[in-house]
Design a protein with these regions (language model features):
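Catalytic cores of nucleic-acid endonucleases
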Residues: 7-14, 18, 23-34, 38, ...
């Protein structure tokens, strides 16, 4: 995405959440967005056919700009509060790709 570098951190986060929601919709999920800031969950997704429910924290992928690991994805880990309630991290790349492990 060309404009991605000109976005503020908040705008990048919002873009990633909308992109993740669109991706999940294509996978058959109904999306329920968050309604408050600083929530450990960004989206709740419920599969239309199976009823599988996911609690998701969306992360935009960041790449290391320097150092010996330059070019590597910066690893994100769920907070203790997120681990307690089984929140999954969903990674969103600048090109709009999404994945669960952030390694593609």
């Amino acid at each position: 995405m060309v404009l991605h570098s000109k976005m503020s951190k908040v705008m990048k986060g919002q873009w990633a959440e909308f992109t993740a929601a669109a991706w999940l919709i294509t996978k058959g999920y109904l999306i329920y967005p968050k309604h408050q800031d600083n929530d450990p969950i960004d989206l709740v997704a419920v599969h239309r056919n199976t009823g599988r429910t996911l609690k998701i924290d969306v992360k935009s992928v960041s790449i290391r700009a320097s150092g010996r690991r330059k070019g590597d994805r910066i690893n994100r880990v769920p907070s203790d509060a997120q681990k307690k309630i089984c929140v999954k991290l969903l990674y969103v790349y600048k090109d709009g790709r999404c994945d669960w492990n952030g390694k593609n």
